[in-house]
Amino acid sequence: MRAIILNGHGGVDALEYVENFPNPECGKDDVVVRVKSTSLNYHDIFTRNGMPGIKISMPMICGLDVAGEIAEIGVNVSGWKIGERVLIDPRNRVEGGLVGETIHGGLAEYCRVKEHQLVSIPDGVSFDQASSLPVAYGTAHRMMMTIG
């Protein structure tokens, strides 16, 4: 699959576009999402820059804010269907992971997550609008409430 991978810390030169990154395998408890939109946020920049406290294995596909369609569902997953429009909550508190940090993120064609990380996208909300909600919206909201 096509992806933008992080091979090391630094500026934009630390990012590499590849066309042959392995597709994620759908485990029995996983959902694979076909990425339709992703937005960049402060955490993606901190990860790329190597901010202390953010530990990742390289190469890593960054991108916390992801929206797309369900492409594959594990056998233990229920309540979701192929083609359903979803956004991904990047936090994975059950397994201690974070999309784009310990789990490959949305700067790729596909992203694998756990079902509890999925949120349905309501009718009338575009993929671009949905992909700005998980982290980018919270950052903007906090700034507006703090600074005014």
Provide a role label for each language-model segment.
Residues I5-G8, N49, I70:
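Residue-level signal for short segments within beta-strands and strand-turn junctions
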Residues M1-R2:
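Extreme N-terminal starter segment of soluble prokaryotic enzymes
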Residues H43-N49:
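Cytochrome P450 core scaffold surrounding the K-helix E-X-X-R motif
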Residues Y17-N20, Y110:
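Well-ordered beta-strand positions in beta-sheet-rich domains
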Residues N7-G11, T38-L40:
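Short polar catalytic/cofactor-binding loops
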Residues P22-S39, M51-N92, P122-V125:
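Glycine-rich beta-strand-centered segment in the early N-terminal region that forms part
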Residues V12-V18, M51-P52:
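Short gly/ser/thr-rich secondary-structure transition/capping motifs
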Residues D89-G148:
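NAD(P)H dinucleotide-binding glycine-rich loop of Rossmann-like/cofactor-binding domains
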